[in-house]
Curated annotation (Swiss-Prot):
Function noted in UniProt: Catalyzes the initial step of the lipid cycle reactions in the biosynthesis of the cell wall peptidoglycan: transfers peptidoglycan precursor phospho-MurNAc-pentapeptide from UDP-MurNAc-pentapeptide onto the lipid carrier undecaprenyl phosphate, yielding undecaprenyl-pyrophosphoryl-MurNAc-pentapeptide, known as lipid I.
Membrane-topology descriptor: Multi-pass membrane protein
Broad class of enzyme this protein falls into: transferase
Swiss-Prot/TrEMBL catalytic activity: UDP-N-acetyl-alpha-D-muramoyl-L-alanyl-gamma-D-glutamyl-meso-2,6-diaminopimeloyl-D-alanyl-D-alanine + di-trans,octa-cis-undecaprenyl phosphate = di-trans,octa-cis-undecaprenyl diphospho-N-acetyl-alpha-D-muramoyl-L-alanyl-D-glutamyl-meso-2,6-diaminopimeloyl-D-alanyl-D-alanine + UMP
Protein name: Phospho-N-acetylmuramoyl-pentapeptide-transferase
Keywords on record: Cell cycle, Cell division, Cell inner membrane, Cell membrane, Cell shape, Cell wall biogenesis/degradation, Magnesium, Membrane, Metal-binding, Peptidoglycan synthesis, Transferase, Transmembrane, Transmembrane helix
Transmembrane segments: 25-45, 73-93, 97-117, 128-148, 168-188, 199-219, 236-256, 262-282, 288-308, 338-358
The enzyme's E.C. designation: 2.7.8.13
GO biological process: cell division; cell wall organization; peptidoglycan biosynthetic process; regulation of cell shape
Length: 360
């Protein structure tokens, strides 16, 4: 929004041209989102407490979690507000990729909001019925996938980039839509599964978003793209502003969500953030690298799949409890230890993902 204003004011004062610089707007985006989160956070938490919108704790979970009962949830509204507010201020709104990311993120956030609302306000333990949650996720992801496929203007936009290989870039054709669908829905639900401990999901999200911002910037810069031998995708550079907004909003939320948490993000936050990571990875053509960088999310998801599959097929559990972070809690690890060690793993996964830019 301010890009439009700056373009107009540049006619009268050339100094306003500074706001056309992408890196400056990215810095201002992260700072704006951070300030919005820190400013709005206390008010939101007090409002949630007043409305008694508190987390319900599973009876079969770790005993240490019983003290979390009643902690305000739906804090993901704070993240969404900061991301949307900062992105709308500092991103170039003529860029259609920006709108795709914001609309998908908002759509999944609404699905999560309805689920949270039914659970904590209407006291329905099931929340939004699983089939309806999956239906609306599928609708949003499918619309985005179809739009991106039919609006693509160059082959690189629908090709699969294989990490660590320079010249392996097969054209997906219509399979692109199927892959995009699974990446968006899968990443959204993976982040949702990870959000079980204080700060556990938000820090890996921050790291992955920052890394995706780097991928967006270099793939949207013709010189960097040529040097790194990756496809030049001119529309992706502007996604750096959205990625930094996610980083800023995430850091602001972590201020309140760090152990012991004052607020939880709820499905409104986890589903939205996961969808944002998924759609950005698709746009910058780094779906396979997302699988690497989001290694913690992958671990959490696979642990649930293994647990359910093993119990149905063999009548035995693989882990003491799934997702896997609860397994380590039941082994006696204090919650902060589980969280920080998973953060360290996430950092390692992200660094490996970034290394694919040169190790080709």
């Amino acid at each position: 929004m301010l890009v439009w204003l700056a373009e107009y004011l540049t006619q009268f004062e050339s100094a306003f041209n500074v706001f056309s610089y992408l890196t400056l707007r990215a810095i201002l985006s992260v700072l704006t989102a951070l300030v919005l989160s820190l400013w709005l956070g206390p008010t939101l938490i007090r409002r949630l407490q007043r409305l008694q919108i508190g987390q319900t704790v599973r009876d079969d979970g770790p005993e240490s979690h019983l003290v979390k009962s009643g902690t305000p949830t739906m804090g993901g509204v704070l993240i969404l507000a900061a991301v949307l507010g900062s992105s709308l201020l500092w991103a170039d709104l003529d860029n259609r990729y920006v709108w795709v990311v914001l609309l998908v993120t908002t759509g999944f956030g609404i699905v999560g909001f309805v689920d949270d609302y039914r659970k904590v306000v209407r006291k329905d333990p099931k929340g939004l019925i699983a089939k309806w949650k999956y239906f609306w996720q599928s609708v949003i992801a499918s619309v985005a996938a179809v739009y991106l496929y039919w609006s693509s203007t160059q082959g690189a936009e629908t090709a699969l980039l294989v990490p660590f290989f320079k010249d392996v870039m097969p054209q997906l054709g219509m399979l692109y839509m199927l892959m995009a669908y699974f990446v968006i829905v899968g990443t959204s639900n993976a982040v949702n599964l990870t959000d079980g401990l204080d700060g556990l999901a938000i820090m890996p999200t921050i790291m992955v978003a920052a890394a995706l911002g780097i991928f967006a910037y270099v793939s949207g810069n013709v010189n960097f793209a040529e040097y790194l031998q990756i496809p030049y995708l001119p529309l992706t550079a502007e996604l750096l502003v959205v990625c930094t907004a996610i980083v800023g909003a995430g850091l602001g939320f972590l201020w309140f969500n760090t152990y012991p948490a004052l607020v939880f993000m709820g499905d409104v936050g986890s589903l939205a953030l996961g969808a944002a990571l998924g759609i950005i990875a698709i746009l910058v053509r780094q779906e396979l690298v997302l699988f690497i960088m989001g290694g913690v999310f992958v671990m959490e998801t696979l642990s649930v799949m293994l647990q359910v599959g093993s119990y149905k097929l063999r009548g035995k559990r693989v882990f003491r409890m799934a997702p896997i972070h609860h397994h380590y809690e039941l082994k006696g690890w204090p919650e902060p230890r589980v969280i920080v060690r998973f953060w360290i793993l996430s950092l390692i996964f992200v660094l490996i993902g970034l290394a694919t830019l040169k190790l080709r």
